[in-house]
Amino acid sequence: MANYTAADVKALREATGAGMLDCKKALDESQGDYDKAVEYLRIKGAKNVSKRAEREATEGLIAVSGNTMVEINCETDFVAKNEAFKSFASKIAEAAGEAKVNSGEELNNLEIDGKKVSEVVDEESAKTGEKLQARRAVTIEGDNVAVYLHQRSADLPPAVGVLVSYEGNAEGAHAVALQIAAMNAEYLTREDIPAEIVEKEREIAEATTREEGKPEAALPKIVEGRLNGFYKSVVLLEQASLSDSKKTVKQVADEAGTTITGFVRYEVGA
């Protein structure tokens, strides 16, 4: 006969986040001793961490604190929308914001309550039974930073996050943040694109134009046209504005009295 009650199982679940069957087994193994049951679950969880490490963690959330943004991953949206997971991620984001961390390595080496984030993540992973990951972090410089977090559905946490540093009008910066979230710009200006990427696009444009049998004399003009199309797709300030497709993002921002000085976009799993 079991020497524990349903209330004991419930208390153990709430304290550890482990599943009901795991909690029952822990209480069985510990003969109803609560503290030993907690220890059993911690050991069991630690043993399973290496197995979880081989799995993919492509769900999760984006969180922002101050000028710092982090991505925390899990395996399923079931865990992603769990309040305990969201609270856990928020705690990491707050610590990252205070320390102004700027990489995944810095994030995982950051200490919270005397433990590295990587250790805290492993402990939380043991509770959830899923692989968890503090994947990356970035801090954007600037006195004025607009933040936008996008939820794909009302019951899920933000899956896309944008930070925009700017000067001038805040509403204009917010509109640009929405643009970045939706259109996934990669660079602020064309000058920010690495030369090797531009050269590769030029080579592709030339090869495509020749494959189409266009006259050699027309080649330079056609290639430049295709390169301009590439710029309009990846350069934020050259994209067509979502609020007025006849104008570029730069034109609309200028009219609003906003100057964009930098941005970062995160998307869960991307």
From Swiss-Prot:
Pfam family, one: EF_TS
SUPFAM superfamilies tied to this protein: Elongation factor Ts (EF-Ts), dimerisation domain, UBA-like
GO cellular component: cytoplasm
Positions of region (Involved in Mg(2+) ion dislocation from EF-Tu): 76-79
Keyword flag Protein transport: no
Keyword terms, alphabetized: Cytoplasm, Elongation factor, Protein biosynthesis
Gene Ontology MF terms in the entry: translation elongation factor activity
Keyword Protein biosynthesis: yes
Subcellular localization: Cytoplasm
CDD domains (alphabetical): UBA_EF-Ts
Domain of life per record: Bacteria
Function: Associates with the EF-Tu.GDP complex and induces the exchange of GDP to GTP. It remains bound to the aminoacyl-tRNA.EF-Tu.GTP complex up to the GTP hydrolysis stage on the ribosome.
Family stated for the protein in its record: Belongs to the EF-Ts family.
Protein's recorded name: Elongation factor Ts
UniProt lineage: Bacteria, Bacillati, Actinomycetota, Actinomycetes, Mycobacteriales
